[in-house]
Amino acid sequence: MKYYKFGETNIEIGSKYLDLYLEENNYEEDQNILINKLKENGFLLIKGLHDKQEISSIRKKIISILTKDDIFDSGKNEITGNLKEGIIKTSTVRGNEKIKIPELDILYSRNKFTSFFENLLGGEIISPEFKWLRTVGKGSSSKTHCDSVYMGRGTKKMLTCWTPIGDVSPQMGGLAICLNSHKKNEILKTYAKSDVDIDLIEGHFTDNPLEMVDKFGCKWATTHFKAGDVLIFSIFLMHASLTNTTNSLRISCDTRYQRKDDKRDNRWFGECPLMHYRFHDDNNIKEKLVDSRLRWGI
């Protein structure tokens, strides 16, 4: 039996809780088929939308920039990004704050990539200038949440695109999605309608990922992601990341896309976006998760 760590819980692959399988699609497939799959499943795993060598080059550059922090084992391959023994890198690096590399902007502006999203969304697209570039070290993970609570003031058709910067195994903290969670009305009418800057909730839905299976019947699924892959999903789809149990730094980048003529969440657009003006203010007291769940009645 094989187990992966999910938060503080070890979950058996192939159990009722977690599958090591996500349906794969090619970017050249019929767009109508992909659109219908996205609507039905809430996600698309697209193989080879980015150039593998370009992704590898970006990973090398990010690791090179972070080398000055003296966190890497210099004896390892430069693309591996192995952390020194005893160092736990748990911080999230924001692309707009610490690492600014033009290669990321070039990556996401390539015609192959933008054309795919324009076909998927049925019109000219726009993306927030802000990019969520993340480095995830040993012991780190993200909790169960959907993106609507963070960026739900604009169109409800906004899509998240998660790009692994390099190969990402489940052991490295790959993303896991909660199948069919975007169809759960009890969540859509309560938690998913929340706004972290208005309601000052904690952001995530549960501390226990197994609850999504036991209470809501939504199984988790992940896979071995390869450089060049992208995982596209609805802002209402519950997701999380497995815990990185390796010494390799997981690097990924989140970007968001919507039709240019759709309503925007202005917290995330412009050269100096407002972002989370209350949620990240330590002077504001957030509602405890247990109290939020009681208020929602779920």
State where each predicted segment sits.
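Non-heme Fe(II)-dependent double-stranded beta-helix
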Residues: 2-41, 47-144, 150-151, 280
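Short, conserved beta-strand element in jelly-roll/cupin
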Residues: 152-170, 224, 232, 256-259
